[in-house]
């Protein structure tokens, strides 16, 4: 069971506070309804928030956003590296989201819905096989990562699975992604 959408400290406080989602998840685990409890979150604060979450509770898994563009940001990278250290110390699983996120949808402003776009995602995903292959290869080349969540549109699933089977070296993946002038953090504008 993953506590979802815990991407900042206010959300973490709600989830881990009295009467929060964590209490229900732990109860479900104690009753044998779930084997493990993890945490997931979106946004540029997610790695720092998930580090704090691991200080509060021994989550079995952490699912945090990671891709090449996100790790280019020095602050994000530092938070991510500290999270990786703690995940290793606690022997938790580290999974990623946003591996194939290309950028925000063009013409969708902060707080606006992304409905009507080509895919059922709130960000624009890569949708060309070679770009997906590069993005998946780049993420999975990091040994701390135990898995990735696919983009939220089933039409991309086959390309993501194929990308995993046909991975390219990290250097080639990085070069392929760097050639996309529109590659950007999907967290520049968050949807409603």
PLM features: residue spans?
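Beta/alpha (TIM)-barrel catalytic core signal, keyed to glycine-rich beta->alpha loops juxtaposed to Asp/Glu
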Residues: 3-192
């Amino acid at each position: 069971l993953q506590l979802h959408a815990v991407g900042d400290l206010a959300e973490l406080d709600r989830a881990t506070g009295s009467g929060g989602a964590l209490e229900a998840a732990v109860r479900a685990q104690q009753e044998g309804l779930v084997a493990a409890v993890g945490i997931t979150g979106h946004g540029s604060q997610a790695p720092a928030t998930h580090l704090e979450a691991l200080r509060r509770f021994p989550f079995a898994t952490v699912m945090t956003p990671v891709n090449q563009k996100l790790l280019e940001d020095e602050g994000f990278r530092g938070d991510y590296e500290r999270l990786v250290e703690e995940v290793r110390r606690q022997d938790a699983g580290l999974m990623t989201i946003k591996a194939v996120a290309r950028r925000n949808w063009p013409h969708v402003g902060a707080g606006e819905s992304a409905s009507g776009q080509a895919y059922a995602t709130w960000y624009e995903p890569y949708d060309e096989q070679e770009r997906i292959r590069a993005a998946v290869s780049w993420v999975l080349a990091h040994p701390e990562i135990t898995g990735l969540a696919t983009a939220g549109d089933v039409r991309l699933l086959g390309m993501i699975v194929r990308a995993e089977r046909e991975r390219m070296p990290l250097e080639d993946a990085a070069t392929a992604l760097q050639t996309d002038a529109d590659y950007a953090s999907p967290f520049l504008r968050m949807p409603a």
